[in-house]
Design a protein with these regions (language model features):
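Conserved alpha/beta-hydrolase "acid-adjacent" motif
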Residues: 230-236
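Catalytic active-site module of serine/aspartate enzymes centered on a nucleophile-bearing elbow/loop
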Residues: 247-298
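Short beta-strand/loop motif that positions the catalytic acidic residue
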Residues: 217, 223-225
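Conserved HGGG/HGGXW glycine-rich cap/lid loop of the alpha/beta-hydrolase fold
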Residues: 7-61, 65, 79-80
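Flexible "cap/lid" loop of the alpha/beta hydrolase fold
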Residues: 114-153
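Conserved alpha/beta-hydrolase catalytic His-Asp/Glu region
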Residues: 150-199, 204, 213
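Active-site loop/oxyanion-hole signature of alpha/beta-hydrolase fold enzymes
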Residues: 50, 54-95, 269
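Conserved hydrolase catalytic core segment
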Residues: 86-128
Length: 298
């Protein structure tokens, strides 16, 4: 490490900590695991595995056309086997949540707990509704038009950086250049983007939908999201949680698409508490249980 040969692809992998394993699947596509590094704080009680999907970040050796759910999930399971874990908890953020859903549906016996963070069971929220949500929040017509193209992969590599910066403030509850600068100094500068993966992913995701299969998920599941996420707003999270038997729903206030960055302590605590309590079934008389913060530890 930090690279491992998995199914003929060189995956960038970081493993930290000790305890029961937790795999982190990053979003994008076209990004890397850096946005999920706040979860390294769980390394005192879990073996935390961060990696870059094939064709993303610093993972190399695969053509972008190979970035299919079949390959992405097979890569993850081959990584599990290579690391010697029988089962592991899986946290998927945004696009990584789509991969996590595909993974638990294809390899159900390998997942002990599932955390779906700011994601959905279909593509329509990001590809069909995000631009309209931005318009409703008062964003200018140019930003709305960029969003309509960006999340469907209808941009060029040359447009990627410019479009990303235009959309950047929309990801937060309250955009802060100071916080962005701090995050960059704390390691955000290491993020490696791959525009070709975003462009291909936008096309790959068109029509993707596993909402009718959510009832097959039999592991303890937490649906976790920022209240002000324009890509996956609370109503999408309620639908996702309602479709998964006994799923728990937690909405983080004053946070957007990346609650792990805006409300770090609260988000990490929600994940830690869920992993500790996941063996306790959610109430059966309520389709979706809300996981309340635990009392402060001494």
């Amino acid at each position: 490490m930090p690279t491992m040969s998995i199914r003929g692809v060189s995956l960038f992998v970081e493993v930290v900590g000790h305890g029961s394993p937790l795999l982190l699947m990053h979003g994008g596509p076209g990004l890397d695991h850096v946005s999920l590094t706040p979860f390294r704080e769980l390394a005192d009680r879990h073996t935390v595995i961060l990696y870059d999907h094939r064709c993303n970040g610093r993972s190399t050796g695969a053509a972008v056309e190979s970035m299919t759910f079949e390959n992405l999930t097979a890569d993850a399971d081959a990584l599990r086997e290579a690391l010697g874990f029988e089962r592991w908890a899986v946290l998927g953020h945004s696009f990584g949540g789509h991969v996590a859903l595909e993974y638990v549906l294809r390899y159900p016996e390998r997942v002990s707990q599932l955390i779906l963070m700011d994601t959905a069971g279909d593509a329509r929220w990001s590809q069909e509704h995000a631009a309209e949500i931005l318009a409703g929040r008062g964003y200018d017509a140019k930003t709305v038009a960029v969003a309509r193209r960006f999340y469907c992969g209808r941009i060029t590599s040359n447009d990627f950086v410019r479009a990303s910066f235009r959309l950047l403030p929309a990801y937060d509850h309250q955009f802060s250049l100071l916080r962005l600068a701090r995050e960059m100094l704390e390691g955000g500068w290491r993020m490696k983007t791959r525009p070709e993966a975003l462009i291909f992913g936008g096309k790959m995701m068109r029509g993707w939908n596993v909402m009718d299969r959510l009832g097959e998920i039999g592991v303890p599941t937490l649906v976790l999201a920022g209240h002000d996420d324009f890509l996956f707003p609370p109503e999408s999270q309620a639908l996702l949680a309602a479709g998964i038997p006994n799923a728990r729903l937690r909405i983080i206030e004053r946070a957007g698409h990346n609650p792990q960055s805006e409300r770090t302590a609260e988000t990490i605590r929600a994940v830690a508490d869920f992993l500790a309590l996941a063996t306790v079934p959610a109430p059966r008389d309520v389709g979706t249980a809300v996981l309340r913060p635990a009392p402060a530890r001494a």
